[in-house]
């Protein structure tokens, strides 16, 4: 995405500061060995989970995870992230991968935030639909279709308007399938 690339180039062209990878107690996450009151900052350990999850899958399926993550991998790695973590996934994560001799992401796909009927999703305000509850009512592929119809190369937020969702599914899928079935 051009806007992500431009923002990363702006940061790289500026005065990058040292990155403090520790947080003081009280904090959650992984403790730093030999430092009782210090924890690794979440954006240090969280992306490492991508490799750990891949390795777990590969171990269970007798695949060498380095075929995917190794420096000489022929596979592409695509990161789908929210716009608020571009800084970490576009600067620090590639630096960590490079220093560890892992392959770098082929592409970073950043998207905006998701709102529900025009409101920010929030547990406390009860403006939230969990994926499992949604799947009890609608097929997940319908939601994927709806989101895909809303996405573009920009980093715009997406509003899940349930009335618009039903209208879009009915007009784009049900109506067209009905017309095809008439032939």
Language model features with spans:
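Structured secondary-structure scaffolds
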Residues: 1-183
């Amino acid at each position: 995405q051009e806007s992500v690339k431009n923002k990363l180039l702006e940061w790289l062209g500026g005065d990058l500061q040292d990155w403090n990878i520790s947080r003081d107690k009280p904090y959650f996450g992984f403790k730093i060995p030999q430092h009782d009151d210090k924890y690794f900052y979440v954006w240090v350990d969280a992306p490492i989970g991508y490799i750990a999850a891949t390795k777990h899958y590969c171990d269970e399926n007798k695949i060498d995870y380095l075929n995917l993550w190794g420096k000489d991998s022929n596979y592409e790695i695509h990161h789908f992230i929210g716009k608020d973590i571009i800084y970490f996934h576009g600067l620090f994560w590639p630096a960590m991968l490079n220093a560890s001799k892992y392959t770098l992401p082929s592409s970073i796909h950043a998207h905006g935030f998701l709102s529900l009927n025009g409101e920010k999703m929030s547990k406390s305000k009860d403006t939230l639909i969990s994926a499992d509850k949604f799947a009890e009512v609608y097929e997940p592929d319908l939601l994927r279709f709806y989101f895909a119809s809303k996405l573009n190369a920009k980093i715009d937020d997406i509003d899940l308007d349930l009335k618009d969702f039903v209208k879009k599914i009915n007009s784009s899928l049900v109506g067209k399938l009905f017309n095809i079935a008439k032939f």
